[in-house]
């Protein structure tokens, strides 16, 4: 039906007859001539009709926005005075002499020239995707996946599919369960990741695997999460953590060059401990120049319990955050920041304006200055690197609360005061994560997942001191986003059982849930390691949007619902009966 895409026409096509298909983006009737902007997935081109071609002109007079049409015409160069430098096709136009109306469009429930509600955009997603900026994002996504496949193929990786219907295993989030009709009372789980299957593939001898795969997690509602998402999943055998990082870094660098024309350079490597100490985050945004500074040793003896309490507590932390030029902040600004850190559990936000660095006590303005002697004050100013015109914020609490609150404040202040250089890219690797973290119920949870190998420790030593163990894990971070995470995997049955024991998974439960893995580990398992990129987040970064739903064709809302199809929906009672499922209605529900 078409010979060319609208957005691909240029001066090289002048004189050629073309047939185009698409939608009327805009129509203008100038009396003697009718102009339309015709749009398809590749862009927009101007088409005009004159009265000499009566049938086409008559039909063009009836066109309205979003009518679907076919146009045949001749490509002409626009007069110099009428060229539009803001359009890729602005040097040419199409003189239309044939027009077929394929389908009319009713008045649209979306206004392409206005901001539409998120709910409406998702309900009429097929219309929302017609917008050029949305089409461009999905085209970039397709370009990214095609590039990744070429790269992985060129590096000897095999694209191998793994099951979608599998066994429920604890991987950190709730599973989506699928009932079995054949096996009454039993359920499959949709995979949270292909983790165990890709490890089994390593045991099968496929030493370089990858897959671009859907994953499912029934998580609590968050704006940046989707119940179904896509991973670029990678696993290797007989490679060290450094070798895996080298290949994955090469992929990221090649991808950024392909899509953005940007050379990311070598990625710095930072330990988890350093990232938390300096930036208050395990995914630090290095475009932001602000850093956290520990001052607990300076304030242990001050007559200010807010500082001295955490300073003398082994589980406490006292942090200073210097903000260059921040002395211009108003008291209202400071109070708003105090409310902000409260979100992270902080009980308040102490502050100090440095009006004259050389004047010592007389040069600062702060409600806490009266609690600090000249020596302590000078120590804080010197360690933080304070200059005249700066402000210093303080966080003092348990190490977790102080670190989380001041890390978040660092990001917010960096954005608010335009200190973060958003014109550049700042990648890095974060390594040496703790193996375990407290689960809030007196036990331990795996910081990554239960199949991550600890570094340089025996199963016996791990069980004796699990809190001190370091995981052989690594995350790729870009501009404050974790874009990929991976680790060296456990390839010893004894070590895997030790980790399960530490996590409170008893021997019977180990056999029930992971017996197939423990059995596989008995038969010459190779050392293996891998990584998974979040494709949706990669596309989000590379297309410059801040909403992950903008890079998914048919996403869910933050409530994990689909306004377009009205999913999830109630099941047919006959289907439920066949599956031996009874729905128990909660009191007050309409079930």
From Swiss-Prot:
Assembly and interaction partners: Homodimer.
UniProt keyword Protein biosynthesis, yes or no: yes
Role, per record: Catalyzes the attachment of L-aspartate to tRNA(Asp) in a two-step reaction: L-aspartate is first activated by ATP to form Asp-AMP and then transferred to the acceptor end of tRNA(Asp).
Any one GO MF annotation of this record: aspartate-tRNA ligase activity
Gene3D superfamilies reported for this sequence: Bira Bifunctional Protein, Domain 2, GAD-like domain, Nucleic acid-binding proteins
Enzyme class, UniProt record, top EC level: ligase
Listed name of the protein: Aspartate--tRNA ligase
EC number: 6.1.1.12
Residue span of region Aspartate: 195-198
Entry GO CC: cytoplasm
Subcellular location: Cytoplasm
GO BP annotations listed: aspartyl-tRNA aminoacylation
Entry keyword set: Aminoacyl-tRNA synthetase, ATP-binding, Cytoplasm, Ligase, Nucleotide-binding, Protein biosynthesis
Residues annotated as binding L-aspartate: 171, 217, 448, 489
Family: Belongs to the class-II aminoacyl-tRNA synthetase family. Type 1 subfamily.
Catalytic activity: tRNA(Asp) + L-aspartate + ATP = L-aspartyl-tRNA(Asp) + AMP + diphosphate
Binding residues annotated for ATP, in chain numbering: 217-219, 226, 482, 534-537
HAMAP family given in the database record: Asp_tRNA_synth_type1
């Amino acid at each position: 039906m078409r010979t060319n895409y609208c957005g691909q026409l240029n001066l090289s096509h002048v004189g050629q007859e073309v047939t185009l298909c698409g939608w009327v983006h805009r129509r203008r009737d100038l009396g003697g001539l009718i102009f339309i902007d015709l749009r398809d997935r590749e862009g927009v081109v101007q088409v005009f009709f004159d009265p000499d071609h009566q049938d086409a002109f008559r039909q063009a007079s009836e066109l309205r926005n979003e009518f679907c049409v076919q146009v045949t015409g001749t490509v002409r160069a626009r007069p110099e005075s009428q060229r539009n430098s803001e359009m890729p096709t602005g040097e040419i136009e199409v003189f239309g002499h044939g027009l077929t109306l394929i389908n009319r469009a009713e008045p649209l429930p979306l206004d392409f020239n206005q901001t539409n509600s998120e709910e409406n955009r998702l309900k009429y997603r097929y219309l929302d995707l017609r917008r050029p900026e949305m089409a461009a994002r999905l085209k970039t996504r397709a370009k990214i996946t095609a590039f990744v496949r070429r790269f992985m193929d060129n590096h000897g990786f095999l694209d191998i599919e793994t099951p979608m219907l599998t066994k429920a295993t604890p991987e950190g989030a709730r599973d989506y369960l699928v009932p079995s009709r054949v096996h009454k009372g039993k359920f499959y789980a949709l995979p949270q990741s292909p983790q165990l299957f890709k490890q089994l593939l390593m045991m099968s001898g496929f030493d370089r695997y990858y897959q671009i795969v859907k994953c499912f997690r029934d998580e609590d509602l968050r704006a940046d999460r989707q119940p179904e998402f896509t991973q670029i999943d990678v696993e290797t055998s007989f490679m060290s953590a450094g070798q895996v990082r080298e290949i994955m870094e090469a992929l990221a660098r090649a991808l950024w060059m392909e899509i953005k024309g940007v050379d990311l350079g070598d990625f710095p490597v930072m330990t988890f401990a350093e990232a938390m100490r300096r930036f208050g985050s395990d995914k630090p945004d290095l475009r932001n120049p602000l850093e956290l500074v520990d001052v607990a040793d300076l304030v242990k003896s001050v007559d200010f319990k807010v500082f001295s309490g955490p300073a003398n507590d082994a589980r406490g932390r006292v942090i200073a955050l210097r903000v260059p030029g921040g002395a211009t902040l108003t008291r209202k600004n400071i109070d708003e920041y105090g409310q902000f850190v409260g979100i992270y559990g902080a009980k308040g936000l102490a502050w100090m304006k440095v009006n004259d660095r050389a004047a010592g006590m007389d040069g600062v303005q702060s409600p806490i200055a009266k609690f600090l002697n000249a020596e302590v004050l000078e120590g804080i100013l010197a360690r933080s690197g304070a200059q005249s015109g700066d402000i210093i914020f303080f966080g003092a609490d348990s190490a977790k609360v102080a670190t989380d609150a001041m890390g978040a404040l660092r990001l917010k202040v960096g954005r608010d005061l335009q200190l973060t250089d958003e014109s550049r890219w700042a990648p890095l690797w974060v390594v040496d994560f703790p193996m375990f973290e407290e689960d809030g119920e007196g036990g331990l949870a795996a910081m990554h997942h239960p199949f991550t190998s600890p570094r340089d420790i025996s199963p016996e030593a791990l069980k004796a001191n699990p809190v001190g163990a370091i995981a052989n894990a690594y995350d790729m971070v870009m501009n404050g986003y974790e874009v990929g995470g991976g680790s060296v995997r456990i390839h010893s049955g004894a070590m895997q059982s030790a980790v399960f024991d530490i996590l409170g998974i008893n021997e019977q439960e180990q056999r029930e849930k992971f017996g197939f893995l423990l059995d596989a580990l008995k038969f010459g398992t190779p050392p293996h390691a891998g990584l998974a990129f979040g494709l949706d987040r990669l596309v989000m970064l590379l297309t410059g949007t801040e909403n992950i739903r903008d890079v998914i064709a048919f996403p869910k809302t933050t409530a994990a619902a689909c306004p377009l199809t009205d999913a999830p929906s109630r099941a047919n009672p006959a289907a439920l009966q066949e599956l031996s499922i009874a729905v128990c209605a909660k009191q007050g529900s309409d079930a």
